[in-house]
Structure formats: structure tokens, C-alpha cells
């Protein structure tokens, strides 16, 4: 396949290098088969101006794969004033988003959608209305009641998706919704696409693999945001990947240190370091997808949506390739992880699908161990 692209990862650098650095994140991404990743701006300092974009662009020269910055949509990702989006675009930002902090202000989001049109940019939004279930720890429903945990209702996602689609219609801009977790959310996106909007979406491997009932042991490794939803939601997401409503897989790779996960569920940090097992998870769940569909989900669609070079094999062009085996069953152990953080429920799980290696920036890299 042409080199895989992950459009939503958190490499924690600068500011939180104890959890991940650009170098360790890039190594983990490469092990996972990715030759291009987008990093969210939720760093310290925030990627909200061209000098912060330049930091990532400069660091990228030393890395084995392409690590591209997503420029913040608002200053300091506070959701109040627009950041210098044009400056960041010109300096190399690949998209505009507040990353892990979805934009709550309708006016600001409207302005952002209008603003990116000047440079044919794309806004990425993780859809959660934070005023609903703001203290929630998991999906709101029977399971949350049984476990005695406060919930985040599905409607918090659905309202945000509905709002953002209406704003997209109004502005005729480009929007990518990532981390969709509900059946109704996916249905709204499908309707928006049928209406001809420049609307695309991605889901995470873990929303496809797990559901809320997996939380019955209070496993903090499964504390994620957006939360794991119902079995019916999970089935709807899997169907949407199969039928093409979902454009891409984004790992939402979010490293957390040991202290952030080995505490009570209520206080544990959200997120999974999922980039190394992203492909195997999808291949395990959806073996019926043909090779072309896998290539579209992991590479071609993202390249098209975000105006990246196609990197396919053409005379005189540089190529990016990912080599993968769909039949081999692998069991990744934590000790072989390239990431700085080991917060993943996928370690020691037998998953069908192996990344053999990548060809990126003129170098062939073969994965030597599981």
C-alpha cells in the first residue's frame, strides 16, 4: 500500500516529553506502519503560531517518517479567539483543530470554517458538547448506572455533529469529524455526505474493538474520550467502516504515564497509546475488507482529504510504502513497544495482521520483532 497516514495523534512534544517525544512517537508510528502522522496542537506551548509549527517542521527533518503539525484553531486552544491560521498553514500546518479540546463556541467554529476557505484548508473536530456530561467518566446508560460511574450521554456527541454539519452547510467549507463513537452520529454524517457536503470522518480502532461493557472491571486502560459506547453503537461503527461512510482510521494515539493510569478510575487520565496496534485491530475485526479498502482507510482517503502527495509508485516521484501481511497473527508485548508510554489494552492480545515494514524518506525499515 502507499504509506499509511494517521490524521490524529498526540506526541506530547513539546511540554510533556515524559509521556512521548516526537522521536519515540515517530518510532511507534513507524512500527505501526505509518509513514505520515498528524500531531494535535495540545502541547506546552500550544501549536497556535508559526514558530510552534516551525518547531515541529524542523524536528521532522530528523525523523524517519513525516510528522506534520495540526495548527490550533483558537489561541492557546481556549476556544475564544481564532489563532493565526493562515500563518500556520503557510509554515506547514496540515489542518486546523483544537485537537483534544473540541471548539464549543458556535460563532468561533463558524468563523474558523469560513477562514480556512481562504487557503482551501480542512477543520478537524472531535465532536463533544462539553456542557453535557461534563463530569462523566464513561458512556451514560445502564452500564454506567450499574458501575456507579457518572455518564457522558450520546447526545453530547450527536448535538455537536448536527451543529457542525449545519455550520458546514452554511459556510460550504471542509470538515473532518474524528473519533465518532455513536450510531446516530455516524447516521448524521452519512446524511451530510449524501447531501454533497465536503464532510469526512474517522474512527478509532478502540471504539471498534471495545464497548462500554468492557469497563465492568474498571480498567483504566479503557478510559477514553470520547468514551466507549454501547454494543449497538459499536456495531454501527463497524458497519460504517465496511460500507465506506468512515473515510479513515485515526489511532487517537494518546500516551499517558504509569501514574496517570494506575489510580482510581475517576482520577485516571483518558487515552490509549494505540498507534502500534491500529492496523492489526482493524484487520482482526474486519477481515472481509479487501486490500484496496485497507489502503483507502489507512492511506489514500486521508491523502485526498488533506491534500497530501499521493506517494504512489510513479516514475520520477518519491514513494512512501507500507508492507503488511493480513494472515499472520501477532501478539505484541509491552516490552517491544517503541512508545514511551505503555497505556494500551492491546498488549498481549492475539491480533491478526502484521506490519512487515515501511519505506519512507528514502529508507526501508523492517520491523524485527512482534
Name each model feature, range by range.
Residues 8, 29, 33, 67, ...:
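Divalent metal-coordination and catalytic microenvironments
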Residues 83-249:
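Histidine/acidic residue-rich metal-binding segments in metalloenzymes
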Amino acid at each position: 500500500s502507499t504509506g499509511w497516514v494517521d490524521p490524529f495523534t498526540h506526541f506530547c512534544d513539546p511540554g510533556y516529553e515524559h509521556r512521548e517525544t516526537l522521536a519515540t512517537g515517530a518510532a511507534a508510528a513507524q512500527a505501526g506502519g505509518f509513514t505520515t502522522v498528524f500531531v494535535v496542537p495540545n502541547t506546552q506551548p500550544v501549536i497556535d503560531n508559526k514558530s510552534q509549527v516551525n518547531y515541529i517542521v524542523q524536528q521532522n527533518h530528523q525523523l524517519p517518517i513525516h510528522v506534520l503539525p495540526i495548527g490550533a484553531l483558537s489561541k492557546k486552544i481556549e476556544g475564544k479567539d481564532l489563532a493565526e491560521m493562515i500563518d500556520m498553514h503557510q509554515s506547514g500546518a496540515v489542518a486546523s483543530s483544537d485537537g483534544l479540546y473540541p471548539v464549543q463556541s458556535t460563532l468561533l467554529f463558524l468563523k474558523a470554517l469560513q477562514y480556512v476557505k481562504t487557503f482551501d484548508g480542512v477543520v478537524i473536530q472531535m465532536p463533544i458538547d462539553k456542557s453535557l456530561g461534563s463530569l462523566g467518566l464513561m458512556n451514560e446508560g445502564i452500564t454506567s448506572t450499574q458501575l456507579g460511574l457518572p455518564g457522558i450521554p450520546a447526545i453530547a456527541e450527536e448535538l455537536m455533529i448536527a451543529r457542525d454539519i449545519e455550520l458546514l452547510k452554511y459556510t460550504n467549507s471542509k470538515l473532518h469529524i474524528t473519533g465518532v463513537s455513536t450510531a446516530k452520529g455516524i447516521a448524521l454524517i452519512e446524511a451530510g455526505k449524501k447531501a454533497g457536503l465536503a464532510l469526512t470522518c474517522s474512527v478509532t480502532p478502540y471504539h471498534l474493538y471495545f464497548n462500554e461493557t468492557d469497563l465492568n472491571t474498571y480498567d483504566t486502560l479503557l478510559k477514553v474520550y470520547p468514551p466507549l459506547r454501547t454494543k449497538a453503537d459499536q456495531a454501527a461503527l463497524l458497519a460504517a467502516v465496511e460500507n465506506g461512510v468512515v473515510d479513515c482510521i485515526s489511532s487517537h494515539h494518546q500516551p499517558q504515564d504509569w501514574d496517570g493510569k494506575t489510580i482510581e478510575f475517576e482520577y485516571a487520565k483518558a487515552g490509549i497509546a494505540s498507534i502500534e496496534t491500529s492496523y492489526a485491530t482493524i484487520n482482526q475485526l474486519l477481515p472481509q475488507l479487501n486490500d484496496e479498502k485497507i489502503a483507502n482507510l489507512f492511506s489514500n482517503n486521508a491523502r485526498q482529504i488533506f491534500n497530501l502527495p499521493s506517494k504512489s509508485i510513479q516514475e520520477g516521484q518519491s514513494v512512501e510504502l507500507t508492507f503488511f501481511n493480513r494472515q499472520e497473527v501477532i501478539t505484541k508485548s509491552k516490552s517491544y513497544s517503541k512508545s514511551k508510554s505503555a497505556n494500551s489494552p492491546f498488549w498481549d492480545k492475539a491480533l491478526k495482521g502484521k506490519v512487515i515494514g515501511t519505506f519512507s524518506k528514502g529508507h526501508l525499515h523492517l520491523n524485527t520483532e512482534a
